[in-house]
Regions:
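Aromatic- and kink-enriched transmembrane "portal" helix at the membrane-lumen/periplasm boundary
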Residues: 41, 78-95
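Transmembrane-helix motifs of polytopic, lipid-linked glycan transferases
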Residues: 50-66
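Membrane-interface transmembrane helices that cradle and orient dolichyl/undecaprenyl
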Residues: 105-120
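Perimembrane helix-loop-helix junctions
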Residues: 142-166
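Membrane-water interface signatures at transmembrane helix termini and the short loops
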Residues: 223-257
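Transmembrane-helix signature of polytopic, membrane-embedded enzymes
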Residues: 64-82
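Juxtamembrane membrane-water interface segments that cap and precede transmembrane helices
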Residues: 29-39, 188-209
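Membrane-interface alpha helices of multi-pass inner-membrane proteins
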Residues: 123-137
Length: 257
């Protein structure tokens, strides 16, 4: 019954997913919300929830426009379900904000296949990834995805390869200016850069282990179908699928680090 209900794409499906995401968002944050019921706190939680919904909407748009899945609403359904089994993904504001900017960056990279406004898209993608790293440092690893995209879409002009670094320099200037105006000091790289740590003690929680195990099992299972589908696609469509696959590998690397 659920399968037949979500096998098409309708606005009502997004409404249902929005309501369900609101429920699990409030459920996992109930202790924080009840601890401080001031207007400022409630507005902050609601603003972060809007960030979550905006991320889901962009992801749905990205998948639909590039035909990354069949015409159905299962992509957003599974996204919210996976968020629901990893509580920390909904509790940490920085992770939600970083995720939004990474999704925006991936959207710009996938759109490179049109070969229109290439320089602007490369700049935007690098800039969004840089902003994401301000909230969660290891999001900077997605910067590598830009060069994967340039190779996939055969973007070979030397100037284009400089643009992503230019975007980071612009972001650094903006961050430094903000620090000087607000904190009366230069941008603190020591507090920004995190060291590599393979300490997995944070994953010792039983519920977290179960959630991650479910996601990994599902990912491995779906990869067989995904890779098979890539081989059957024409080149122009195949590149988008391969790019998403690279993004998946980078995401797993971030989880380990």
């Amino acid at each position: 019954m659920i399968t037949s209900f979500f096998k098409t794409t309708k606005p009502f499906h997004f409404v249902i997913v929005t309501l369900f995401s609101f429920f699990i968002f409030c459920y996992y944050r109930k202790d924080f919300i009840l601890e401080d019921l001031s207007l400022a706190s409630v507005v902050q939680h609601f603003a972060i929830y809007l960030v979550l919904i905006f991320s889901i909407a962009i992801q749905a748009f990205l998948v639909s426009k590039n035909n990354l899945t069949q015409k159905s609403s299962f992509n957003i359904v599974f996204l919210v379900l996976f968020l629901g089994i990893i509580p920390s993904s909904l509790i940490d504001n920085n992770i939600l904000l970083a995720n939004l900017f990474i999704v925006l960056a991936i959207r710009r990279l996938v759109s490179l296949k049109s070969n229109i406004a290439v320089k602007k898209k490369l700049f935007d993608a690098a800039f969004w990834i840089g902003i994401a790293s301000l909230f969660y440092f290891w999001a900077i690893l997605f910067f590598v995805l830009i060069f994967f995209a340039m190779l996939l879409y055969a973007i070979g002009h030397f100037k284009n390869w400089i643009i992503p670094f230019t975007a980071l320099i612009v972001l650094l200037i903006c961050a430094t200016s903000y620090s000087i105006l607000v904190d009366n000091s230069f941008f603190d790289f020591n507090s920004y850069i995190e060291t590599v740590s393979f300490d997995l003690s944070n994953y010792n929680k039983f519920t977290l282990v179960i959630g991650i195990s479910i996601i990994i099992s599902f990912t491995i299972w779906i990869l067989f179908y995904y890779i098979k589908k890539i081989k059957e696609l024409v080149r122009i469509k195949r590149t988008s699928y391969v790019l998403i696959l690279y993004a998946l590998f980078i995401a797993f690397a971030i989880v380990i680090i």
